[in-house]
């Protein structure tokens, strides 16, 4: 574990990025096995090839017309009367990219109703399977796909949260109840991102003074208490491929700056510091890639909120690239290219760019130091997508013509650093250095008793 200086002209602060323990790292090598029967699949619908190499499958029946809740109405506002619900209708992709799930609207008998919808993404063409039950769902419910094709749904009635698994059963939908949790007044419960093992699902119960991690799917009997973390936590990023190391953004009890911490679920919720850029800065972890160790960070250490990157377990400084702060837009990363072992600077990162004109896609690599801005497909489910190991970005979308489609975008090629005319006109082309050149950082050892995680040697 080492503490390193961040490049002074960019942030002027010290940064600490902690390595993971060796034991946990070994656990990350093994893939979890579900050990369950595959749920019954309906007959695969016939698909039709769409434009630009995308695929659009079946047309939904008129009796169950799919309505995109994010599509603007005549007033230009999303969702035509369901604006608040549309914001909550997230599109969640399983950790292995095989399935996705969302809540969507159907119009049946002149009445709009919410129902879960599962997308299959790992075949030759994507297709969607509706999972409606006898009663419509509340727009505030959450859905999360598992790697075996079942979909977890969280419902709330007053202070009681119930969990069930939904799966297709021919023409209908099967439901397996998993149990419920009751939360006290002022306690907020939310699902964490899909676990890397594909068979488990976790939730955060956020109270006034502490946060509880629950295993809500994959346990023996109902929700299982996993860990208590002092303080109010948010976010949630998996740091390994075994679903053991979880990063949370924690606000200390009594207030103070928000810092990312690592929670070891295999050690009863042992909490250790993960990010420490400045003593009074808010340092949040947005994304992490287990293969390369690339971290995407948002911090106000430079004086205001900036998007930066670092490497887990490295003594290299955290950098805040100028190209990731374009004017008058908000930039949020949502996917990192996997499979780039020990090459974090070569990872392609997909970003959602929100501006007055709407939402579109950005692609950036640390080594390229340039933000490529690309048009999104019509009906893009903004902020969702995944990379293949070969550098192809898959962007799910749904519109009136294609109710379930995936656009394929190859990552733009960056000019080689230090070569070609593009680097001679870097300012004009928008290619700006991440930070000013500085001497190599001098790493200061931390006493063993203060090291947050042990057993792994920091690369570099």
Residue ranges: model-predicted function:
Residues 2-28, 55-150, 188-192, 352:
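Beta-strand-rich domains and repeat architectures in extracellular enzymes and scaffolds
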Residues 73-83, 125-135, 172-184, 221-228, ...:
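A short beta-strand motif characteristic of beta-propeller blades
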Residues 85-94, 133-148, 182-196, 230-240, ...:
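Repeated scaffold domains used in trafficking and secretory/extracellular systems
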Residues 96-108, 148-156, 197-206, 236, ...:
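Short beta-strand elements that form the blades of beta-propeller/WD-repeat-like
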Residues 103-106, 296-306, 312, 320-368:
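Loop/turn-rich, solvent-exposed surfaces of beta-rich toroidal or solenoidal domains
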Residues 108-119, 158-167, 200, 208-214, ...:
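Structural motif
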Residues 208-296:
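Solenoidal tandem-repeat scaffolds enriched in leucines and small polar residues
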Residues 388-460:
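Blade-level signature of beta-propeller repeat domains, shared across WD40, Kelch, NHL, RCC1
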